[in-house]
């Protein structure tokens, strides 16, 4: 058994740093309203007692700020410390605070807005100095259009006794303590009685008058006297006291079943799981698709079903879409799922992507703030059921996917490779068929007459003999001589025949003498009385010589062979026989092989398309099954729990909505059956669901790098298996039990308090090396331009990401604004902030106003300053831009944030306000440990463009030689932005990895020829580049028109040797290119050689289609 006490100790110690334990001063999230209550509220009795009585009896507390106009400057300075108009000050302050509350709600799903009173302060027995409100009353802030009035709607169902101070005390004592405070009313005396049970005593104020909240440091407390005080302060602010439910859950688990932490956090690594083998054997069996995922997303979904999985999702790699598919798979496998995140925006994205299938999930990010939305989900489900229900739809065939397509594609490629590798023997040489078909020239080889191509080299030897040629010419000369001598060649042939047939010399002499006299050849059988003459003797001798000579040359008489040898010499076949063999073989012997070649290549194309069509059909079938499951969930409950089901479905129509906690407690099992997926924040899950082991089959936690391990334990405890998604190279948790939006980042860094958070483990970091499986998403979709992600891919992700330009990406991706007279002073840069706001106003007059935009600062004060200047401008267009939502209600307005608060956000345009000038040696959070992760988050938010505002040249900033990785990368990134803005990106060395591929000489020769032909035919209209690296991919050729890629060509593509290569390197490479709007065609090397006209036609057609698409755009 492990000792997890350290975890508890860290949790408790961290709570002493939260604003519900130690509140030194007001902040942007907490304001003092004691004097406002006195000056401009409707309250008649403005004492603490009068306020409490009012809050217990009324539902709303109103404020009229116009009353502040009556306060002169001197009184304003005395009461509020304000030297300007008190009315204007608080009008602006309430406006700012109202926006801050709404901003917090957008990011967390909970307003966490409380009226907090009174404040207690002192020192506990463990020497922890505390100062925080005693009681918290949930309120909702409402304002008039011009912020002249505001009111607080009081939620009496959200009354809390400070849980943090009590929690720290009881945990440090290791004691069980029952908090018996009656949360139905506000009662200071009852609250103090609870504290007295823990031996806390407080010195009470002399009067009940409300007091202003003053700034205090821990050094102001007397640690020797240890006197505790109660002060009649009243604060309005964002307090995360509801998050203490997780704190309580954790303590319950640790106190009642400490051994369970060993089980929850044990090392589950599957040492027998061979990831390479998994990918090689991967198929979609038992896996459903809600959308056409890329292959790495499919890996993650399939592995998720095994449970205890970590999904590393770098920026823009489709993590949310992956989670959607995981949830659908779990539902279709009849599992109950809890899906949580610290960020409500992450929950919104996943829920909205379910679209019309959202009825598998119950969304409840906030326990108190979204009652109407909560109950509407049931009413909408009832409407969906009545609209689509029919009994025939309750049965659905389980969809199946033909995984053999991948095997078929691989088989076709392997067959093609085998065909390419087929050895062709010319007699003395072996050639591969690919070399022959790739290198052959169309030569006139029709004169080569051989049946067996294996005898070609022998034929070349025979028919390239110069001696034979000489002998043939001698034969021809001799034949002429014989024709002249014997008065015609036919006479010679007759005489030759007679000489060969007749052995009688006398007869031969007679014939020759007769030939001499009459010039004819006779064939006498007998010459009885003939006596040979000398003349005939000489003629016989001559004939014998001629016949002997003729016979010796007769085998060289063939005119066909003569012509063949002559052609061979003319064609220099003997000197270079290979091209002639290739051409002759292709024309007269390769027909069966060529037919196979065409068949294999055609089969690859058809099967690839069949696979893609099959995926689309499979997605449709899976959605049909999901619809059936949704209808069945409702139908089965309608049959078994009709009254209970209809009661909750009709709740949305009631004017007074019951508390969500009440419904969860009463109908929890029904809610799980009706909605197999529950989507909540961690706090909502802890508040609404029982702290019970195995409550769900799976828990899915998103953005887990920002979840502290302690906060996650109660959530992990509720499920049998976990699926954790996030990115260890993004932000770690900000502050225990407090969102990043709730604390002052700069102060935290200046105080050094953040170091504890930096060194602490997030859930993701802790479980990364303990989970059963770790999988990585690789395809990057967010950035339209590869340049936007290239830096972080190289510097942060070791070139693991797969990315490339969108075909229609803007050409101007980086804009650098050099700020004149910018100065870093008082932790901000005023001139730079002014320039940023001026730029925003300029963009409202351009087409960029239609886009989404965010401003990211490297310092909170700079962000606050820019927000202030925007507020001051009160530009209607900027105001509209700031409040913009998309079609499904997701916030996509103009934001201004520091780097700590932008994880999970994305915008078309990101504007950076660096703030710092060259005098700075430390860049705040960036220079601290983990600063590189903060930078990574910031520079990966843009989809289309980045604009950088800075005061000095990049090379003037300190940091390149810094020991801080964050500082070093920041300055490198400034230099990168400058280079890209000046179109000097080729000077940057950290681009995508280039493909290194060795090619045979004959392949290079064909490729050169192909390129030359492309240039000759298309070069006048298009810029054609060769060996192009686009992001993470390589292309043989790319056609550009006005710098827009119209067509990419893979020429002579490498043959895959595994299923993994087929899926990752071919099918989903091509699918990714389609999503990036690239037009790609494959040209086989043999296709070009065998049918160049057809290839050119194919290219023309592809260019025409893509040109039409661009014209439509």
From Swiss-Prot:
GO molecular function ontology, one term from the record: hydrolase activity
Organism classification: Bacteria, Bacillati, Mycoplasmatota, Mycoplasmoidales, Mycoplasmoidaceae
Species of the source: Mycoplasma genitalium (strain ATCC 33530 / DSM 19775 / NCTC 10195 / G37)
InterPro entries per the UniProt record, alphabetical: DNA2/NAM7-like (IPR045055), DNA2/NAM7-like_C (IPR041679), DNA2/NAM7_AAA_11 (IPR041677), DUF4011 (IPR025103), P-loop_NTPase (IPR027417), SF1_C_Upf1 (IPR047187)
Protein name stated in the entry: Uncharacterized ATP-dependent helicase MG140
Residues at which ATP binds: 313-320
Disulfide bonds: none
EC number: 3.6.4.-
Enzyme type, top EC level: hydrolase
Similarity annotation: Belongs to the DNA2/NAM7 helicase family.
């Amino acid at each position: 058994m492990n000792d997890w006490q350290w975890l508890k100790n860290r949790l408790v110690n961290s709570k002493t740093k939260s604003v519900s334990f130690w509140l030194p001063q007001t902040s942007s999230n907490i304001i003092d309203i004691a004097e406002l209550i006195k000056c401009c509220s409707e309250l008649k009795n403005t004492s603490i007692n009068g306020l409490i009585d009012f809050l217990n009896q009324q539902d709303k507390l109103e404020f009229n700020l116009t009353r502040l106009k009556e306060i002169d400057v001197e009184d304003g300075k005395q009461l509020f410390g304000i030297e300007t108009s008190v009315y204007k000050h608080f009008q602006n302050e309430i406006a700012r605070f109202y926006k801050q509350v709404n901003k917090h709600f957008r990011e967390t799903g909970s307003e966490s807005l409380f009226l907090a009173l009174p404040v207690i302060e002192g020192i506990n027995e463990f020497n922890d100095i505390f100062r925080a409100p005693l009681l918290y009353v949930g309120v909702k802030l409402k304002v008039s259009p011009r912020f002249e009035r505001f009111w607080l709607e009081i939620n009496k169902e959200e009354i809390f006794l400070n849980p943090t101070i009590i929690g720290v005390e009881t945990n440090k004592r290791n004691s069980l303590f029952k908090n018996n405070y009656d949360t139905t009313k506000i009662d200071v005396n009852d609250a103090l009685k609870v504290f007295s049970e823990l031996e806390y005593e407080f010195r009470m104020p002399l009067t009940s008058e409300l007091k202003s909240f003053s700034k205090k440091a821990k050094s102001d407390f007397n640690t020797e006297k240890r006197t505790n005080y109660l002060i009649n302060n009243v604060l309005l602010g964002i307090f995360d006291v509801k998050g203490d439910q997780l704190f309580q859950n954790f303590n319950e688990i640790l106190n009642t079943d400490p051994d369970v932490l060993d089980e929850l956090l044990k090392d589950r690594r599957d040492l027998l799981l061979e990831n390479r083998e998994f990918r090689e054997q991967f198929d979609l069996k038992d896996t459903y698709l809600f959308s056409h995922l890329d292959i790495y997303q499919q890996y993650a979904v399939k592995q998720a079903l095994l449970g205890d999985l970590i999904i590393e999702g770098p920026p823009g790699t489709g993590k949310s879409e992956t989670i959607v598919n995981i949830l659908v798979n779990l539902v279709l496998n009849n599992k109950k799922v809890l899906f949580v995140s610290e960020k409500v925006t992450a929950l919104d994205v996943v829920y909205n992507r379910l679209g019309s299938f959202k009825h598998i999930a119950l969304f409840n990010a906030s326990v108190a703030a979204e009652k109407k939305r909560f109950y509407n989900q049931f009413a909408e489900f009832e409407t969906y059921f009545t609209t689509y229900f029919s009994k025939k739809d309750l049965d659905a065939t389980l969809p199946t996917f033909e995984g053999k397509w991948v095997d078929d594609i691989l088989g076709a490629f392997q067959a093609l490779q085998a065909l390419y590798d087929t050895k062709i023997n010319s007699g003395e040489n072996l050639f591969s068929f690919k070399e022959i078909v790739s290198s052959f020239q169309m030569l006139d080889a029709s004169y080569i007459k051989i049946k067996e191509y294996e005898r070609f080299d022998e034929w070349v030897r025979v028919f390239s003999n110069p001696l034979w040629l000489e002998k043939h010419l001698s034969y021809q000369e001799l034949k002429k001589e014989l024709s002249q001598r014997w008065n015609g060649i036919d006479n010679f042939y007759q005489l030759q025949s007679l000489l060969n047939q007749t052995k009688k010399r006398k007869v031969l002499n007679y014939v020759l003498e007769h030939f001499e006299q009459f010039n004819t050849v006779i064939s006498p059988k007998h010459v009885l009385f003939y006596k040979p003459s000398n003349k005939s003797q000489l003629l016989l001798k001559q004939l014998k010589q001629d016949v002997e000579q003729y016979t010796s040359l007769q085998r060289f008489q063939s005119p066909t062979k003569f012509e063949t040898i002559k052609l061979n010499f003319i064609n220099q076949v003997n000197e270079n026989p290979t091209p002639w063999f290739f051409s002759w073989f292709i024309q007269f012997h390769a027909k069966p092989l060529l037919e196979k070649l065409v068949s294999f290549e055609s089969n690859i194309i058809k099967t690839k398309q069949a696979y893609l069509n099959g995926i689309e059909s499979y997605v449709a079938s899976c959605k049909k099954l999901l619809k059936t499951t949704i209808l069945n969930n409702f139908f089965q409950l309608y049959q078994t729990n009709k009254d209970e089901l209809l009661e909750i479905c009709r709740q949305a129509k009631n004017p007074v909505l019951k508390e969500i906690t009440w419904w969860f407690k009463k109908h929890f099992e029904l809610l799980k059956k009706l909605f197999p997926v529950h989507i909540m924040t961690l706090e909502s899950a802890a508040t609404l669901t029982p702290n019970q082991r195995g409550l769900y089959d799976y828990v899915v936690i998103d953005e887990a790098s920002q979840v502290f391990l302690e906060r996650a334990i109660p959530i992990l405890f509720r499920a049998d298996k976990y699926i954790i998604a996030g990115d260890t190279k993004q932000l770690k948790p900000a502050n225990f039990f407090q969102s990043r939006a709730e604390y002052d980042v700069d102060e935290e860094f200046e105080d050094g308090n953040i170091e504890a958070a930096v060194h602490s483990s997030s859930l993701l970091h802790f479980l990364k090396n303990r989970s059963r499986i770790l999988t990585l998403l690789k395809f990057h979709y967010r950035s339209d331009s590869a340049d936007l992600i290239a830096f972080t891919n190289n510097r942060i992700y070791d070139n693991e990401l797969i990315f490339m330009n969108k075909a229609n990406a803007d050409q101007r991706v980086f804009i650098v604004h050099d700020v004149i007279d910018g100065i870093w002073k008082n932790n901000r840069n005023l001139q730079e902030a002014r320039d940023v706001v001026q730029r925003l106003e300029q963009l409202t007059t351009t087409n960029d106003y239609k886009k989404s935009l965010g401003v990211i600062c490297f310092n909170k004060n700079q962000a606050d300053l820019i927000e202030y200047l925007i507020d001051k401008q009160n530009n209607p267009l900027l105001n509209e831009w700031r409040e913009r939502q998309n079609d499904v209600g997701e916030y996509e307005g103009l934001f201004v944030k520091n780097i700590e608060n932008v994880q999970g956000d994305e915008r078309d345009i990101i504007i950076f306000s660096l703030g710092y000038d060259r005098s700075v040696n430390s860049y705040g959070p960036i220079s601290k440990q983990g600063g590189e992760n903060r930078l990574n988050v910031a520079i990966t938010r843009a989809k289309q463009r980045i604009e950088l505002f800075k005061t000095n040249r990049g090379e003037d900033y300190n940091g390149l030689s810094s020991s801080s990785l964050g500082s070093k990368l920041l300055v490198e990134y400034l230099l990168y932005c400058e280079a890209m803005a000046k179109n000097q990106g080729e000077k940057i060395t950290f681009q995508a990895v280039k493909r290194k591929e060795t090619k045979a000489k004959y392949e290079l020769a064909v490729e050169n020829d192909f390129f030359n032909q492309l240039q000759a035919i298309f070069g006048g209209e298009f810029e054609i580049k060769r060996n192009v690296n686009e992001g993470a991919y390589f292309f043989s050729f790319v056609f550009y028109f006005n710098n827009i890629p119209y067509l990419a060509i893979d020429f002579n593509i490498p043959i895959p040797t595994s299923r993994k290569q087929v899926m990752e390197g071919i099918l989903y490479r091509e699918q990714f290119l389609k999503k990036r709007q690239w037009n790609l065609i494959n040209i086989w090397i043999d296709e070009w050689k065998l049918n160049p006209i057809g290839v050119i036609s194919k290219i023309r057609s592809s260019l025409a289609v893509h040109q039409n698409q661009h014209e439509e755009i």
